[in-house]
Amino acid sequence: MTTVGLAVAAAAGAIGLGWWLTRHVRARWLPVLLTYFAYGASGVTAIALTFFQKDTLGLQPADVARIAFWLGLPWSMKMVVGVASDHYPLLGERRRPYLLLGAGLSIVGYALLASSVSTPSAYLAAMLLVTVGYMIQDVVADALSVELAADDRELKQIQALGRTFLLGGMIAAGGKLGGWLAGAFGSRPVFAMAIVLPAIVAVAGLFVRPQRTVQALPDSGPLAGHNAWIVMTAGLAYAAFGALLGLLAVARAQEIVLLVSAVLIGTLLWQVGVTRAVLVAAMVIFLFRATPSAGQGYTYWAIDGLGFDQDFLGWLAQVSAILSFVGLVVFRRTITERPVSFTLLWVTLAGAVLYLPNIGLFYGLHAWLGISARSLALIDATVSAPLAQLTMVPMLVLIARTAPRGAEATMFAIMASLMNLALSASELLTRYLNEHFAITQQDYSHLGQLMLVVLGASLLPLLALPVLQRAEADLERTHPPAGAVTDRRTGR
């Protein structure tokens, strides 16, 4: 698309969006909705980050997985930030200062990426600032979405609009636009442009009405009495512990942090009063989420070996973003009405089958079929993308059915931390595989073997399905389904 065409499309989109906003959105909701949009649109830097890691920093695939592990950990601390925002005001207010703090951290992180970052350690520090910033913004937006609603009807409206703005940001900025910007301007200018996103949140945050009343502590559950202080102290100690291990380059630091995280989350699950059946089901879903991937080694090879550039990778991301949303809409009802074990079975088997074209690309399947590598990659993305957003839905269904009365929000927060921890475990396993097969930018010869191992590993959790089915039978007796469940978020 030409520059003129992009300008015309942007102008038309802006006019249409403005008309729609005036009809459906109240002004006081905008800080929340713009926060969700900014988080969704933050994917605009994804392709720029890939080329920055590869070309500017010279990171090997195992190094990328090592960094991704640390970047996933802040999302397991959402509950701690939620407690802080609820019970420990900053500058006399409960929401606005935290929102501005989160936006400020992301702005500083992007500014460092755009200017001075030139080493892996500096890159990790800058990305942690960006990630922690978005995590804080996300927590505050979740809380504000409840506080701004005058009644249940308004709450449902805000939740639906939140999902719309989040997905709108992902689709609008996370694919073709991100690839085009990275190709046309380079990585650092894209990071500079991305500063606009948290800046929008900061400006919107100035219009949040002050919330000076400290929320009363609940009478039961993990936050009862003085337990909120314990959660805060433990969370801060955990963050300091992880940072210290990383800075001192302690051997097996990631494994130690993962183990400590699992113990902390397990303790919270025990305090909230989950049953054995729920715990078993959560552990099985954890196994499915923790399976390794090929990591950046495959993307690096596609760039070097197949000639995939920023623009084409942007197209793939755009197709995946749109069709993953379509898949969520089409399959959500089926998923929520069937047992979790059934959903995990068919999603896993389908995902394994649809992973085969990626392996085929490495071994020259496109040449054998007489089509270009880009055509096969685009076909594969089109077919497999609808499954991308489905793996978290079973956990949402499970939580909604089994959360102790009055502790639903706490249960969601703890389980979200557990699932984010599973993604960190996945990055750890990905690092192991890349190190074992010695995948580097100079040598991709063992990449095919790695991908075959990843395919096999994706099927291993199926062995735990009989255990999950027995747990589901217990849940059917103790927590009969009350209807379909929906959730307004599609990610962390």
Feature-to-residue mapping (PLM):
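C-terminal transmembrane helical hairpin of 12-TM major facilitator-type secondary transporters
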Residues: 342-394
